């Protein structure tokens, strides 16, 4: 089966959903021919993955995932693809903590760093939060504190099968955009940052029709966040429609150089996050309130981004966000 599909893809033929899904199901149930599957991934990348092909990857790995039974009308994730190569501070993780101060349930899906200094798992671990909490703890945390971290390797054991191959290939493949599409919690809302405009288009096409409201973002200066330096392209998804527009930070009185929000070690990033939640008005602060403000708009807490920024700022300035972090550290103690 794999050789037949490989022949089609190397000739730049698009595949049907069932062709890819059946292939992946067989691979995940049986033996993996790394050479042929690696060639398939590389050929698929060269051809350009279609919505049907990506959806088949998502469904095949989601079928094998450990899922969490948590149904709520306002579940949201702010997990990005990572891999933008900019080495910025953990903006979406900090924004997720502020977001949990509101009446939404933040299911933060993430992993350790692969390309940056500090992934979401790394910084949360340094904050003393157990990134491998048991399921009952996760569900209780979502219910009581509006926040849980879902450490991707715990929920996607099937990914281990392709881990060595991905490392050996050393190039971006369809797997680099799957993470945000595989949250173990059923999401109503989502903000996904991507590493390129091409990835942005692909993720948006797959999300369409699968969330109540979502947005996929990539900035002109290459960030997988809403930028505080340049305009950010937004693909907003609602009712199966995709609307494109740009967010300019200057419209909200925010303008800083991208280098002003660079990230460091997990320890240093944890210190920066605490300083943000304590209300220190640094570029990091404005990056967090801008991104949280946008998320509040997407999950329909704020009527627009401007109101979202005001709400985010108030949550920090009132110490509500800092107290939330203290609650999370106490609840998800890791002993670090």
From Swiss-Prot:
Residues binding Mg(2+) 2:
224-225
EC annotation?
2.4.2.18
Q: Where does anthranilate 2 bind?
A: 166
Cofactor comment text: Binds 2 magnesium ions per monomer.
Q: Which UniProt keywords apply?
A: Amino-acid biosynthesis, Aromatic amino acid biosynthesis, Glycosyltransferase, Magnesium, Metal-binding, Transferase, Tryptophan biosynthesis
Question: What biological-process GO terms show up in the record?
Answer: L-tryptophan biosynthetic process
Q: According to its UniProt record, which reaction does this protein catalyse?
A: N-(5-phospho-beta-D-ribosyl)anthranilate + diphosphate = 5-phospho-alpha-D-ribose 1-diphosphate + anthranilate
A Pfam short name: Glycos_trans_3N
**Entry cofactors:** Mg(2+)
Instruction: Cite the binding residues for 5-phospho-alpha-D-ribose 1-diphosphate.
Output: 80, 83-84, 88, 90-93, 108-116, 120
What functional role does this protein have? Answer: Catalyzes the transfer of the phosphoribosyl group of 5-phosphorylribose-1-pyrophosphate (PRPP) to anthranilate to yield N-(5'-phosphoribosyl)-anthranilate (PRA).
Assembly notes: Homodimer.
List the HAMAP family hit by this protein, alphabetically. TrpD
Q: Which NCBIfam families match?
A: trpD
What is the protein name for this chain? Anthranilate phosphoribosyltransferase
């Amino acid at each position: 089966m794999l050789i037949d599909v490989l022949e089609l893809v190397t000739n730049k033929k698009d595949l049907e959903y069932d062709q890819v899904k059946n292939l992946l199901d067989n691979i995940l149930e049986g033996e993996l021919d790394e050479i042929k599957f690696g060639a398939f991934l590389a050929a698929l990348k060269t051809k350009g993955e279609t919505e049907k092909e990506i959806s088949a990857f998502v469904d095949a790995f989601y079928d094998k995932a450990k899922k969490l039974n948590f149904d709520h009308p306002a579940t949201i994730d702010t997990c990005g693809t990572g891999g933008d190569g900019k080495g910025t501070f953990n903006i979406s993780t900090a924004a997720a903590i502020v977001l949990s101060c509101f009446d939404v349930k933040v299911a933060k899906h993430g992993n350790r760093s692969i390309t940056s200094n500090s992934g979401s798992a790394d910084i949360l671990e340094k904050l003393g939060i157990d990134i491998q909490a048991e399921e009952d703890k996760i569900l209780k945390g979502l219910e009581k504190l509006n926040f849980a971290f879902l450490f991707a390797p715990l929920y996607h054991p099937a990914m281990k099968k392709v881990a060595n191959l991905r490392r050996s290939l050393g190039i971006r493949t369809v797997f680099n955009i799957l993470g945000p599409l595989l949250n173990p919690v059923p999401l109503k809302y989502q903000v996904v940052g991507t590493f390129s405009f091409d990835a942005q288009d692909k993720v948006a096409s797959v999300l369409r029709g699968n969330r109540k409201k979502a947005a996929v973002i990539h900035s002109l200066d290459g960030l997988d966040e809403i930028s505080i330096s340049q305009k950010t392209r937004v693909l907003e998804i609602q009712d199966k429609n995709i609307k494109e527009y740009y967010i300019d930070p200057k419209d909200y009185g925010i303008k800083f150089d991208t280098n002003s929000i660079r990230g460091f070690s997990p320890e240093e990033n944890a210190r920066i996050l605490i300083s943000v939640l304590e209300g220190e008005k640094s570029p990091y602060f404005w990056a967090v309130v801008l991104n949280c403000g946008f998320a509040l708009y997407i999950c329909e807490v704020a009527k627009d981004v401007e109101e979202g920024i005001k709400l985010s700022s108030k949550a920090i300035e009132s110490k509500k966000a800092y107290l939330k972090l203290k609650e999370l550290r106490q609840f998800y103690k890791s002993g670090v």
